[in-house]
Amino acid sequence: MKSIKSAGDRFFAVIAYIIVILSIMSTTVMWNYLKGAFIPIGTYRYLLLAISLLLVLVTNSYNFKDLSFITLIICYLLVFIFFSQINPFKYFSTFCMPLTASLLIVFVYYQHGKGNLLLASYANIVLIVAGVSLFFYFFGSILGLRIGAIDTNYYWADNPHFTTSYCYLYFHQPLQDQIYLGHHVIRNTGIFTEAPGYTLFLLDGLIIELFVKKSKTFWRIGLILVTLLTTLSATAILLGALAVLISFLQYLQAQGKLNLKIVIPVFLLLLVLGVIVIRIRKSGGSSYSVRVDDLRIGLTLWSQNPVFGVGFGNEGALIKMFAFHRANNGLSMGLTTLMATGGLYLALYFLVPFFTTLFAPSRRYLLPISILLLLEIIISNISTNPVYLMAMALLWYAVLNDIREQGAFAGTNYTSLYF
């Protein structure tokens, strides 16, 4: 990122860090679930919406095309209310509000040519969290050094659980530990309640480092990859490996050394092996059973109402179909959850950018990002996650600008100019 010189740059940089922090705080970070936590998660979403509206007013960002698109999306979301059995408050507070805020923030930043500040602030925070978690993971969880350690409780799905906090910057979750090949294995969950939440946080940082930044910084990429390995999430590790592989293939293509006759069969073989590894890795545990049950429930409910689903926030319809007791009332797979409760209508917001990038002039740059974001929502229930919604807003902006200016990304500084 270029050095920040003007007052305007400093303003956008500071606000970018505030936006990223609020977005992360709106997710499943431990501070929201500790005993005595007094700030509701919804508060951060309201603050994000307030900041987005203030940004539009303060910066005079009234681009007709951009605001028309955002208005169209808002109207599209409102129409859903009239055709679906819906929990209005939950729909507005957990989906419409953060989605609208994300679109406004992204469009304001890129209209003023400051979009790189949003991406840089997120990437920097990921690096800080990863570095801190690795330090406490090795010296605290593995070696047993109680550096600023405090034993406390947190509440997940309304049930109390034990955790050890290290200076409130890293949390060892015994509930997340696993038995692998007869050995007790400790997972690095960072500042999150569960390893999957942490892995997605890291993966988004990896996407920025590999596909958004024009120049690669290998120590940053290495730090994220090492941290991903310590989460012991087979799915996330394979996604990280896939991201690195795609980035390497892009490099070979740029050097004119890419032989598709060799690469495509190898790529398909690795993909099949990856699926087999996940199948074997999870088949012995409850995680696999839950995902199979989720797939069954999601497809069954979606078949009942393919267009609008059974109703956003309709947990009763989900609970009635559970094959066994769970710790929470939701599904773990994002796309099937969205299809079941919001139908194809809401799912289109996440699917359209992916299919558009297949034909975009600069699909070479956009398609890897689009594929990885699509895989994220398939494997994890993150359709209301403000960080993920921000990533989708960035993808929408990149796609729309590429359509407006044919070949806009070709031969340009992809990182600093657009996405």
Set out the residue ranges of the language-model regions.
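Transmembrane signal-anchor hairpin modules in multi-pass inner-membrane enzymes, especially those
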Residues: 1-82, 401-419
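Transmembrane alpha-helices of multi-pass inner-membrane enzymes
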Residues: 49-50, 369-376, 383-419
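A membrane-periplasm/extracellular boundary helix in multi-pass inner-membrane enzymes
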Residues: 135-144, 247-287
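Long extracytoplasmic/lumenal interhelical loops at the membrane interface
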Residues: 30-38, 280-342
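Helix-loop-helix junctions and helix-breaking kinks within/between transmembrane helices
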Residues: 34-42, 82-99, 188-200, 218-248, ...
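Hydrophobic transmembrane alpha-helices and their immediate junctions
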Residues: 213-225, 241-249, 341-377
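Alpha-helical transmembrane segments of multi-pass inner-membrane proteins
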Residues: 120-143, 166-231, 239-249
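Transmembrane alpha-helical segments and their membrane-water interfaces
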Residues: 55-58, 86-142, 350-354
